[in-house]
């Protein structure tokens, strides 16, 4: 019976027979085609006139208006830095608790399931919740802290579990306090990589401010999101947008320089004079890191000191969650796709499949074209283009292109695909550039084309990273589509926004809880796969 499904390649490894792989490929292809048919509409030819008018309006800014750009930008810097630092610190502690290779199962599993549960809440829910409890600056700080804590925990945990832990176990076995051993052997030894992660998360959180402004979060993103809301005023967008883009480009350049000259590890030099020079460089690097830490700490403390911690409605949280978990069963048996949350989830899944298919194809293309296989001019030009795409607010792109596409969900998918592909393309380029140059040069010397090298060497070599990218992009796609539901990007996201605005928290819970279960099941399956608990993935499909 086993031979019907698998063939043996070694004593411990099997592979699926080719016809089952073919059947699986056909099923996946059919699902993708159905998802595209279900979610894509044609172009609205008459909408091109509105598109050109909107484009002209965008580049005809209202220069007489006082935008208070400095005040809004400084406000954003305060709460993003503060929230990112607080979230990162909490994430370090939770990553220590949730790492299966560090903690016993009875500690790691419940803690990880707890973070998965909290992460399953759409970010809109807690943004709206904080808005009802606190003033704008505290709401913004808490939202960034919440977001950074939960998502940083996920990635830092994976990083810790993939680290060399021999020294940690040696120290912890010598009756040294376990956390102290963890700090000395894992955190300190990998400080450069953790700093890099913090800087990249800071940069990502600044980009997220425009999206979070949809949910009422204050800051410079508010100056962009508000004119793009109900009554679109494109002439008010350009000046704050250019300010934000300029700041993001400055931030990207700063992160690049810090990565290149401060946080990048250097190999040990053999020559005495080179060693002395290396030690001198390390001293300067330490000074720069201390200065960076002081600047970030200063912004964090300054923000925390000036915050107003007054709670507007102390009883609101208890009342909210009491209603939130009182689900309406009539919704679950309705045949209307605009009412039944299960049908909404089915629709959301097809949207996510369409989105990640586009993201994966575009990111692979971007990563390939920006890699070392192409000329330096081509690579740098594309990297700069991807950088510009990443810093342009996705809300603006949606408003610009929406008139020329019949359905808003199609526009959202295209906009998110381009934005996400620009980010993931950068990661894929790094993975491709880290491949064995000797093998690539040898293949080029034998006359193999770039596409042949991509298909037969780069993709197979980086398959684990590509699969991780694919799985992460599906999870992120679901959450992004929910956020953009306010603009018609998804039914379920639109309903969450409507029910919160009307204070219909029971209906909100009825719509949100199935989505949370859906996300939790996906994360638990993904966790099991990554920890090799589901051996069929590793042994039969890999």
From Swiss-Prot:
Biological-process GO terms, alphabetical: transmembrane transport
Keyword Iron listed? The answer is no
Q: Which domain of life is it from?
A: Bacteria
The UniProt keyword set, sorted, is:
Cell membrane, Membrane, Repeat, Transmembrane, Transmembrane helix, Transport
Q: How does the entry describe its membrane topology?
A: Multi-pass membrane protein
- Which InterPro entries does the entry mention? MetI-like, MetI-like_sf
Compartments reported by the entry: Cell membrane
Domain (ABC transmembrane type-1) spans: 349-526
Cellular-component GO terms for this entry: plasma membrane
**Does the keyword section mention Ubl conjugation?**
no
Query: Any transmembrane segments, and where?
Result: 23-43, 77-97, 114-134, 140-160, 212-232, 236-256, 287-307, 350-370, 386-406, 412-432, 481-501, 509-529
Q: Which family does it belong to?
A: Belongs to the binding-protein-dependent transport system permease family.
Function recorded in the entry: Probably part of a high-affinity transport system.
Per the record, the domain comment is: Composed of two homologous domains.
User: What is the protein named?
Assistant: ABC transport system permease protein p69
This chain's source organism reads: Mycoplasma pneumoniae (strain ATCC 29342 / M129 / Subtype 1) (Mycoplasmoides pneumoniae)
């Amino acid at each position: 019976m086993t031979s019907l499904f698998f063939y043996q390649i070694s004593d411990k490894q099997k592979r699926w027979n080719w016809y089952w792989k073919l059947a699986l490929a056909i099923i996946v292809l059919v699902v993708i085609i159905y998802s595209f048919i279900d979610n894509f509409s044609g172009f609205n030819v008459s909408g091109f006139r509105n598109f050109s008018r909107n484009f002209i309006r965008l580049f005809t800014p209202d220069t007489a208006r006082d935008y208070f750009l400095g005040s809004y930008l400084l406000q954003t810097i305060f709460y993003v830095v503060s929230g990112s630092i607080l979230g990162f610190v909490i994430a370090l502690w939770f990553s220590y608790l949730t790492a299966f290779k560090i903690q016993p199962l009875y500690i790691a599993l419940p803690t990880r399931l707890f973070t998965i549960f909290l992460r399953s809440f759409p970010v809109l829910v807690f943004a709206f919740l904080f808005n009802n409890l606190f003033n704008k600056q505290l709401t913004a700080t808490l939202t960034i802290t919440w977001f950074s804590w939960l998502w940083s925990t996920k990635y830092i945990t994976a990083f810790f579990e993939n680290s060399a832990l021999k020294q940690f176990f040696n120290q912890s076995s010598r009756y040294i306090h376990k956390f102290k051993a963890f700090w000395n052997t894992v955190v300190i030894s990998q400080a450069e990589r953790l700093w890099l992660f913090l800087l990249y998360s800071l940069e990502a959180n600044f980009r997220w401010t425009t999206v979070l402004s949809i949910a009422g979060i204050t800051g410079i993103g508010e100056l962009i999101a508000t004119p793009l809301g109900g009554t679109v005023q494109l002439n008010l967008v350009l000046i704050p947008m250019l300010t934000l883009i300029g700041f993001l480009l400055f931030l990207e350049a700063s992160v690049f320089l810090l990565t290149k000259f401060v946080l990048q590890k250097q190999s040990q030099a053999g020559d005495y004079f080179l060693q002395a020079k290396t030690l001198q460089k390390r001293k300067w690097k330490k000074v720069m890191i201390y200065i960076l830490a002081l600047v970030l700490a200063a912004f964090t403390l300054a923000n925390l000191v000036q915050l107003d911690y007054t709670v507007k409605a102390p009883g609101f949280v208890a009342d909210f969650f009491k209603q939130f978990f009182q689900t309406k069963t009539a919704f679950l048996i309705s045949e209307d796709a605009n009412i039944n949350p299960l049908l909404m989830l089915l629709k959301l899944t097809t949207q996510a499949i369409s989105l990640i298919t586009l993201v994966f194809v575009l990111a692979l293309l971007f990563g390939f074209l920006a890699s070392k296989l192409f000329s330096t001019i081509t690579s740098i030009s594309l990297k700069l283009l991807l950088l510009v795409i990443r810093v342009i607010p996705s809300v603006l792109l949606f408003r610009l292109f929406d008139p020329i596409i019949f359905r808003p969900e199609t526009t959202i998918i295209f906009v998110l695909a381009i934005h996400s592909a620009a980010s993931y393309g950068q990661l894929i380029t790094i993975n491709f550039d880290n491949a064995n140059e000797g093998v690539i040069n040898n293949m080029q010397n034998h006359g193999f084309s770039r596409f042949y090298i991509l298909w037969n060497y780069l993709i197979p070599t980086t398959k684990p990273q590509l699969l991780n990218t694919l799985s992460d992009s599906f999870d992120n796609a679901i959450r992004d589509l929910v956020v953009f539901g306010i603009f018609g990007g998804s039914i379920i996201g639109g309903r969450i926004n409507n029910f919160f605005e009307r204070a219909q928290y029971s209906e909100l819970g009825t719509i949100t809880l199935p989505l949370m279960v859906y996300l939790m099941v996906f994360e638990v399956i993904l966790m099991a796969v990554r920890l090799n608990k589901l051996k069929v993935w590793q042994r039969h499909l890999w």
